[in-house]
Amino acid sequence: MDTKHLIASEIQKVVPDMEQSTILSLLETPKNSSMGDLAFPAFSLAKTLRKAPQIIASDIAEQIKSDQFEKVEAVGPYVNFFLDKAAISSQVLKQVLSDGSAYATQNIGEGRNVAIDMSSPNIAKPFSIGHLRSTVIGDSLANIFDKIGYHPVKINHLGDWGKQFGMLIVAYKKWGNEEAVRAHPIDELLKLYVRINAEAETDPSVDEEAREWFRKLEANDPEATELWQWFRDESLLEFNRLYDQMNVTFDSYNGEAFYNDKMDEVLELLESKNLLVESKGAQVVNLEKYGIEHPALIKKSDGATLYITRDLAAALYRKRTYDFAKSIYVVGNEQSAHFKQLKAVLKEMDYDWSDDMTHVPFGLVTKGGAKLSTRKGNVILLEPTVAEAINRAASQIEAKNPNLADKDKVAQAVGVGAIKFYDLKTDRTNGYDFDLEAMVSFEGETGPYVQYAHARIQSILRKANFSPSNSDNYSLNDVESWEIIKLIQDFPRIIVRAADNFEPSIIAKFAINLAQCFNKYYAHTRILDEDAEISSRLALCYATATVLKESLRLLGVDAPNEM
């Protein structure tokens, strides 16, 4: 139990009619440590208890008896709590040393499934930095939900269907070279895609020709299907090589095409529930009662189905297959209206489980303030970017520690981790400007900074030949170690908050804070001095390293023992 919950439960024993959540929301951290570690203002109880806040505070302070507190005192209308730092430090350190990497593991999910729609790059287009956010946010959320007892199901809903394949087929038939595509599939397909889009801007017939080829593809035309399958196979090989490098795995690669034969059922269900309305020859579902102005366009006048029809089929399939407790879609902010429509249509179909579906939006990655666009050829490709990040990490490692073993492996962990961490430390709904130099820096709020703090602690533990033991009586009450203890004690709650808000940045910011606190402690403390507290200081180091490593793991980032 963290200190806030400990205090809230003690106050509730004295004031049982007050909800613990209310008490928690009222607790304050005094500006001056001489006023205690936490304070409870009694103003809100004055009306119900019909007493002055000062008297209420005094009554509460007198009735609280716990060996977790050095003292509890009333100062005016406030109850000030002074925690027994030595006792709490000992408890926290023993818990982490006992649990190891399992520290802060919880069973909130009770093994229930969480379906996570993530990554979902478009076939025949390069894997760009734009796809990175969905990939790393989804992967981190999977780790976070797993940590609190859910079973994550990671779904790569590949963009392997749509009019863009009509465009690509037209481009390939006009200018394509089979040998060139086989040698460098993604590069060549991107060139074709950019070229055909440029031509379409001045020649309207290109769009019509692309639509015709896509209609052929929907009708299983052999030539169209063969080209589509080839584009898909080549792209997947490329993507999987990158996923391996990023250490990201999936449970399903069922993309848009997988649902081609599952959309008729959606149309039949909508018709049977009398939800389809004709509008200008198209079939729509009105959603005004949900405050959604524009109806959901289910089927166009030419008979072509739409993105939402496919997503309805996917939602039904996932509920039947995984019986999810939560289904989350890690997709950009720009798709918010689409997901509101998707949930509303399912609600209209009387599927109350649609309440368990959540769009987890995120902001854009820009470069020099400019939006990235594959269509316009303004794109940062992930593969060369990762390679450059690894090279930059290798250069810094060479300068810091030229005799390091496994330099290449460490550089890989630092370079890849730097890109992931920089993305995940940003509040999800905000965008960020891509800056590789800032990402790979060992200074500031970066992945390498946190990794280096972990490696520094491992070096201390190796020098001391420390092995964790629960038999020792650890006791620390200095200011710097107490700041670390409070953070470590808070880690279980931090993980739950990250899950509740679908927000990995909460973990990333926690890791930065913990690394900063340790570095401050390291600068002020002679950790290896042979005195009565050495085992306690080393236990604190071990616990800090354990929690730093686990924080990084939840973000999908490795923590090397040496850098």
From Swiss-Prot:
Would you tell me the Gene Ontology cellular component terms?
cytoplasm
Key word Transmembrane helix present? no
* An MF annotation (GO) of this entry: arginine-tRNA ligase activity
Top enzyme class, one word, equals ligase
Keyword annotations from UniProtKB, A to Z: Aminoacyl-tRNA synthetase, ATP-binding, Cytoplasm, Ligase, Nucleotide-binding, Protein biosynthesis
By its UniProt entry, which InterPro entries does this protein fall under?
A: Arg-tRNA-ligase, Arg-tRNA-synth_N, Arg-tRNA-synth_N_sf, ArgRS_core, DALR_anticod-bd, Rossmann-like_a/b/a_fold, tRNAsynth_Ia_anticodon-bd
Q: Known EC number(s)?
A: 6.1.1.19
Checking CDD domains in the record gives: Anticodon_Ia_Arg, ArgRS_core
Task: Tell me the disulfide pairings in this chain.
Answer: none
Which reactions appear under catalytic activity for this entry? tRNA(Arg) + L-arginine + ATP = L-arginyl-tRNA(Arg) + AMP + diphosphate
Q: What are the subcellular locations of this protein?
A: Cytoplasm
Predominantly, its location class is cytoplasm
**Domain of life, per the record?**
Bacteria
Where does motif 'HIGH' region map?
121-131
GO BP field: arginyl-tRNA aminoacylation
Q: Does the keyword Cytoplasm apply?
A: yes
Family of the protein in this entry: Belongs to the class-I aminoacyl-tRNA synthetase family.
What PANTHER family has UniProt attached to this entry?
A: ARGININE--TRNA LIGASE, CYTOPLASMIC, ARGINYL-TRNA SYNTHETASE
Q: How does it assemble?
A: Monomer.
Name it: Arginine--tRNA ligase
The species this protein was found in: Streptococcus agalactiae serotype V (strain ATCC BAA-611 / 2603 V/R)
Q: Which gene encodes it?
A: argS
